[in-house]
Amino acid sequence: MGASEKRKDYISWDEYFMGIAMLSGMRSKDPNTQVGACIVSPDNKILSMGYNGFPKGCSDDEFPWERENDKDSNLTKYPFVTHSELNAILNYRGGSLEGTKLYVSLFPCNECAKAIIQAGIHTVVYDSDKYRGTPSNRAARRSAFHTAGQDVRYISGSERQIKGV
């Protein structure tokens, strides 16, 4: 490669934004599942980011991180954790999210799918689909994304090792 030619091995926009989503997920204190999300404008500007965690003002040390509790299901993380997609939507302080793209490291649950559609986000790009086939996952695919006409696609965020990460 001569000095007058541009580099050819740079990462794509999809790789870049999925990398940002995955990096955001590393902020999660959840010991089992770390999910990150990044909302991007049609002209490839980052608008917002989020990761799964407890709401503002709720101490990470006082609320449970357990996935199961045989005595009381309210003593698990599930009633309290806000998912990365919803955090990214709520963290946005601009105008409309109409026509934007959401990069998320894990395929959205049905509740997040509804919020994504209502926010006007048009494209969802995800990396992992480890809950494929679960009731929430099937509902998100069928009733939410498919019916609403969302563009949903898979990319692997780990196709290329990001140096220094």
PLM region spans:
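Zinc-dependent deaminase catalytic domain
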Residues: 1-165
